[in-house]
Amino acid sequence: MRKLFLLMFCLSGLILTTDIRPVRADVAGLIPCSQSDAFERRLKNTTQRLENRLKKYEPGSAPAEALQKQIDKTQQRFDKYRNSGLLCGADGLPHLITDGRWSHAGEFTIPGLLFLYIAGFIGWSGRSYLQAVAASDNSTEKEIIIDIPVALQSVSKGFVWPLAALQEFSSGKLTARDEEITISPR
């Protein structure tokens, strides 16, 4: 009981003395794009170049409308950068922060994890298809000419690939036994 009380006392002292104010650390001299003069200059120069090209065409013509759409898309893109909280460098370009901070997770961490999930999904579905086809009579032919029902079944199994991989790894089915691995006689 004394140890529990002492632990609670130490934890409460630690919590009370910890400063938990939000801190905004300077990230390699980057500033928010909404406050960057170089970012605004880049927007102005980009749209001005497009507007100069637009003056060469008659209003309402196909090239003029295409350039106007490009100007609108450029302004929308810069507005997204400005409003998303991205940080810009001295060149006025947005920079992605990849240091693992949760405040910048949307820039690199979440897309990276999504990429790994999709790559694993494709690999697991392909592996499942090849294993299912290997048990059939015409396995070589089915590797070239895809059997759609088997492929759809394999793809449906692929959505839960992280759980299936963990299950197969823990059961030992995912990895080869030591006896199955050949050793070079060198």
Swiss-Prot record:
Annotated Gene Ontology cellular component terms: cyanelle thylakoid membrane; photosystem I reaction center
Identification of the protein by name: Photosystem I reaction center subunit III
Membrane topology reported for the UniProt record: Multi-pass membrane protein
Function: Probably participates in efficiency of electron transfer from plastocyanin to P700 (or cytochrome c553 in algae and cyanobacteria). This plastocyanin-docking protein contributes to the specific association of plastocyanin to PSI.
Subcellular localization(s) per the UniProt record: Plastid, Cyanelle thylakoid membrane
Signal peptide range in chain numbering: 1-25
Transmembrane segments: 105-125, 144-164
Alphabetically ordered keywords of this record: Cyanelle, Membrane, Photosynthesis, Photosystem I, Plastid, Signal, Thylakoid, Transmembrane, Transmembrane helix
Keyword Magnesium in record: no
UniProt gene name: psaF
InterPro entries: PSI_PsaF, PSI_PsaF_sf
